[in-house]
Amino acid sequence: MITRRFLCGCIPLVAASAITSRAFGANAECAVYTHDRQRALSSDKAIGLLKEGNERFASGRTVNCDLLAQAKETSTAQAPFAAIVGCMDSRVPPELVFDQKIGDVFSVRIAGNFAEKNIIGSLEFATKVTGVRAIVVLGHNSCGAIRGAIDDVQLGNLTATLANIRPAVASTLYEGDRSAGNSAFVQAVAEENVRRTVALLTQKSEINAALVEAGELRIVGAMHDLATGRVTFLL
């Protein structure tokens, strides 16, 4: 017969077991990346870690780590496993979207997540010097920079910035309303911009191209949904 006392005694044990299990998982997720740990990762595994992190973020199961402890551990060296080329939009912080911590990823952000020589040069440092295993070009829906490029906005230095996105506007295959007021067209251009950026990261970089050819680096594109938090990787 199961008594009230037995149940009351077991419940704390079950709860403690669950907490211990979560703590063990958190400890694994919170371990900082060393060069040995980074080099042991395949490029596919690096992408997989980002997918797993986004699943945690989108399902409300992010891992809580001691960030100050991580800052101290990484103060003398860094060995991130991936680099994210993202938009400067305040709603798309890559480290949070992929549930990564201090020292896990390089984050390169600019309005419209495009690639030009300074961004590509920064990524060559990440890939060749530091050894990241993957680059993700991360776009998002309802992007203001994409809308600005579609509308051919002229505004100070922003004009030159948006000029980097306009080729994606021109190359987007879309029949119908090609204005910034059409969210479907904006989404289509955003995805085309991501794909073009992915291509440019090897077309304009012999270093990245060689690493991809050697199987040491993967470069992929993805789109973030502002409402759900989910990231969809593009084929």
Feature annotation, model-predicted:
Residues M1-V14:
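N-terminal secretory signal peptides and thylakoid transit peptides that target proteins
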Residues C8-C10, A28-A77, G103, G112-R133, ...:
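Divalent-metal-activated hydrolytic enzyme cores
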Residues T20-A23:
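N-terminal signal peptide c-region/cleavage motif recognized by signal peptidases
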Residues V85-C87, R109, V136-H140, V220-H224:
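Short beta-strand segments
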Residues M88-R91, E95-N113, N118:
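Active-site cofactor/substrate anionic-group-binding motifs, chiefly glycine-
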Residues S90-R91, H140-A145:
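Gly/Ser/Thr-rich loops at beta-strand to alpha-helix junctions
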